[in-house]
Amino acid sequence: MSFSLKDEHHRFVCYISAGGKKEAFPTVTEAINQAPTSTLFYFKAFKAAHENPKELLGMSLGHGNSSLSIKDIYYSCTIGENELLALDIYIKKYNGDAEETLQKIYFILDKVIGEYDTATCIGEITLHKLQSKKGLYPLVELANELKGEMTRQTISL
C-alpha cells in the first residue's frame, strides 16, 4: 500500500498494489470494491503511472550497488509471444547485473506506464549496454507507445 498527496478534492489517495504479480490482481480488485468511502481518502487499485513521465527524466533510482538515471534508459520493442510487448532496454552505464537492474527497471516501468500495464502489457525484457541511440526511444515515451498500440488494436478489431 502507498499513499499520495491530496488530490484536487483534498483527499489522500491510497494505492493498493499487487506487487506486480498478476495472480494477486483479483485480490486487489476485491479489496478496492470493499474499501470504505471517506471524505478524507479514497482507494485506487495498482500503482499509478506518473501523470507526465517526461518529468521523471531528472530522477535516478539508487538501490543496491548502483544508481540508474532514468534519462540514460532507452528502449525498442516488438510484439512478442501472447501479443505482449517484448522490450529491449538499453542503459548507458549497464554493468551486466541483470537481476539488480531488472528490479530497478520494473520499478521505473511502474512509474512510466503504471503497475497494471507493466504486468499485463510487457512480456520479456532484455537488457543491453547503450552503444547508440539510433532507432531507440527514451523509456519515458513508452506510455505513448502503449496508447498507440492499444489504438491500433482497437481500430483493427
Q: Which residues make up each language-model segment?
A:
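Aromatic- and glycine-enriched beta-alpha-beta binding-site module
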Residues: S2-P53
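Long, disordered, Ser/Thr/Pro-rich
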Residues: E8, G58-L61, L142-A143
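Histidine (H) residue identity feature
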Residues: H9-H10, H50, H63, Y116, ...
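Surface-exposed beta-strand edges and their flanking turn/coil or helix-capping segments
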Residues: T29-A31, L56-M59, E100-Q103
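Short, low-complexity, polar/charged sequence segments that are solvent-exposed and flexible
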Residues: Q34-T37, G62-N65, F107-L109
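Aromatic/basic-lined ligand-recognition segments
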Residues: L40-N95
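Long, hydrophobic alpha/beta structural blocks
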Residues: T78-S156
